[in-house]
């Protein structure tokens, strides 16, 4: 215990910049869902990795953007609130895109909070015409900051980043067991897995403004688990899309979700999906509490 070190790290950035992919890469498990949809991550996802005497606690956060509706505003508030519990803040930047006004706003707010982030220039495994300009801007405007060119997808330079992070850890007791990878409840993880499969299998047919709740989790005598989940949408037409012809689409989504759950949890799962229409669910705080935002 006396040799234990601990550090908490917050990962922030624009939507689809690679935050969730980075978290999954570092902990070695697909914990945070990743889809082509923007604003996939809605709440703070905690990932944990213990390397020798050092425990690293990572916070994957919702992407920061210009919010409009109630859900989007809650997500952005959630992202900024995560900074207060972190020892180190990493701002991940998509090197395939130029700096935009939102990125500059993020930098301005960090400066106003007296936070000096570590800059992660992500997606360097793909040639970018913007990378040199991004580096020049950071060197010219943030000369005291460190930046790491990385690829969260391929793992390039991730070991070097981890060496830096662990080197900043302070002597403190671990907060979690050595083999823990998250503190999220299994019910929440199961709901996230189903939400990911909804986005992957419906793609542009369905807006991201749906939510999934695990209503029942029953441990059975044969060591398997029965899970009942409800998919909540705002329109009856979305329910029709999710169900598919004669229920074919929801069966496909359920099958893929079940397989992902069994791989992640390590035990057999009996998954039952239901769809409910709740027109104004975004205006009800109970849903935000369940989503942890």
Swiss-Prot record:
Region called G5, residue ranges: 150-152
Primary subcellular site in the record, as a coarse category: cytoplasm
SUPFAM superfamilies named in the record: P-loop containing nucleoside triphosphate hydrolases, Prokaryotic type KH domain (KH-domain type II)
Record-annotated KH type-2 domain positions: 202-279
Region (G4): 122-125
Chain spans, region G3: 60-63
Pfam name, any one: KH_2
Annotated binding of GTP, by residue: 13-20, 60-64, 122-125
Region entry G1, spans: 13-20
InterPro entries: G_ERA_dom (IPR030388), GTP-bd (IPR006073), GTPase_Era-like (IPR005662), KH_dom-like_a/b (IPR015946), KH_dom_type_2 (IPR004044), KH_sf_prok-type (IPR009019), P-loop_NTPase (IPR027417), Small_GTP-bd (IPR005225)
Entry membrane topology: Peripheral membrane protein
Span of the signal peptide: none
Domain (Era-type G) ranges: 5-174
GO biological process: ribosomal small subunit assembly
Location in or out of the cell: Cytoplasm; Cell inner membrane
RNA-binding in keyword set: yes
Source species, domain of life: Bacteria
Region annotated G2, chain positions: 39-43
PROSITE patterns in the cross-refs: G_ERA, KH_TYPE_2
Family statement: Belongs to the TRAFAC class TrmE-Era-EngA-EngB-Septin-like GTPase superfamily. Era GTPase family.
Oligomeric form and interacting partners: Monomer.
Listed HAMAP family: GTPase_Era
Chain's role: An essential GTPase that binds both GDP and GTP, with rapid nucleotide exchange. Plays a role in 16S rRNA processing and 30S ribosomal subunit biogenesis and possibly also in cell cycle regulation and energy metabolism.
Name under which the protein is recorded: GTPase Era
Organism: Rickettsia akari (strain Hartford)
């Amino acid at each position: 215990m006396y040799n234990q070190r601990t550090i908490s790290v917050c990962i922030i950035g624009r939507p689809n910049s690679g935050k969730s992919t980075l978290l999954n890469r570092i902990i070695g498990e697909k914990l945070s869902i990743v889809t082509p949809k923007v604003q996939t991550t809605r709440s703070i996802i905690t990932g944990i990795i213990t390397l020798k005497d050092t425990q690293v606690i990572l916070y994957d956060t919702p992407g920061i953007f210009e919010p409009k509706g109630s859900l989007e505003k809650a997500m952005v508030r959630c992202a900024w609130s995560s900074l207060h519990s972190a020892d180190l803040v990493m701002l991940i930047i998509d090197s395939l895109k130029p700096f935009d006004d939102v990125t500059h706003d993020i930098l301005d707010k960090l400066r106003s909070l007296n936070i000096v982030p570590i800059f992660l220039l992500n997606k360097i495994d793909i040639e970018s015409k913007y990378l040199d300009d991004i580096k020049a801007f950071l060197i010219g405007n943030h000369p005291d900051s460190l930046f790491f060119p990385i690829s969260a997808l391929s793992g390039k330079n991730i070991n070097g980043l981890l060496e830096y992070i662990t080197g900043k850890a302070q002597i403190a007791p671990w907060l979690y067991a050595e083999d823990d990878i998250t503190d999220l409840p299994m019910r929440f993880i199961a709901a996230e897995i189903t939400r990911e499969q909804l986005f992957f299998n419906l793609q542009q047919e369905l807006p991201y403004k749906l939510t999934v709740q695990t209503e029942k989790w029953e441990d059975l005598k044969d060591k398997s688990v029965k899970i009942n989940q409800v998919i909540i949408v705002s329109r009856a037409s979305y329910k029709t899309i999710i169900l598919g012809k004669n229920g074919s689409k929801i069966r496909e989504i359920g099958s893929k979700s079940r397989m992902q759950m069994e791989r992640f949890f390590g035990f057999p799962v009996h998954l039952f999906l239901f769809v409910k229409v709740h027109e104004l669910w975004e205006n009800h705080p109970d849903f935000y509490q369940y989503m942890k935002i």
